[in-house]
């Protein structure tokens, strides 16, 4: 059963979204607080095909440790009205594997995400949280002119949301773990469509 989280003073981003009439927030992942949650999400049937992390909780704990120690990325928990519902990894593209597949600029950012709670499927929530996290990355560093993505070509639902979130397909690339669509979201276009 989902429980509303305690009031959180350590939110990295929080904004009411009038399209879904709910507040979308992000906070840094905390291992002790979020381990069981992330483990449960990684073992959800809808998450396994993309993330391939259906593993024992000890493996997820090690994965969290690696991510928290990695200077090129930060893990976040996404919340809707205070309830945890998604996991995000924000990364600096130039320092990521993806940076070898296109001419990455120093401040290009990217993200990986999963919606862990099936109760949040539908009702326009996924595009809203994608736009919110993309906005967060643009706000987090004014030098970021582009947010990039590399969803699997098999991630049809996510690819369907891309245009509604100002992401433009650049072509397909073969990454070590998947065939992916290279997607760019330019700051200027995002601001024109959604504002900051």
Swiss-Prot record:
Cited SMART domains: AlcB (SM01006)
InterPro entries registered for this protein in UniProt: Acyl_CoA_acyltransferase, Acyltransferase_MbtK/IucB-like
Alphabetized UniProt keyword annotations: Plasmid
Pathway in which this enzyme or protein is active: Siderophore biosynthesis; rhizobactin biosynthesis
Biological process terms in GO annotation: rhizobactin 1021 biosynthetic process; siderophore biosynthetic process
Gene3D superfamilies membership: 3.40.630.30
MF term (GO), any: N-acyltransferase activity
Similarity section: Belongs to the IucB family.
Name by which UniProt lists this protein: Rhizobactin siderophore biosynthesis protein RhbD
């Amino acid at each position: 059963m989902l429980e509303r989280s305690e009031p959180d003073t350590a939110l990295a981003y929080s904004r009411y979204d009038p399209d879904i009439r709910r507040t979308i927030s992000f906070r840094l992942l905390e291992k002790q607080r979020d381990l069981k949650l992330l483990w449960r999400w990684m073992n959800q049937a809808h998450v396994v095909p993309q993330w391939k992390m259906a593993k024992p909780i000890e493996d997820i704990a090690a994965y969290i440790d690696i991510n928290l120690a990695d200077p090129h990325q930060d893990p976040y928990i996404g919340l809707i009205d205070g309830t945890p519902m998604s996991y995000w990894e924000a990364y600096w593209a130039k320092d990521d594997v993806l940076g070898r597949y296109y001419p990455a600029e120093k401040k290009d950012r990217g993200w990986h995400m999963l919606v862990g709670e099936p109760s949040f499927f539908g009702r326009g929530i996924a595009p809203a949280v994608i736009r919110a996290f993309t906005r967060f990355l643009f706000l987090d560093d004014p030098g970021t002119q582009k947010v990039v993505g590399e969803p699997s070509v098999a991630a049809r639902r996510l690819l369907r949301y891309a245009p509604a979130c100002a992401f433009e397909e650049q072509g397909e690339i073969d990454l070590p773990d998947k065939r992916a669509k290279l997607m760019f979201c330019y700051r200027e276009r995002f601001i024109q469509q959604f504002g900051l």
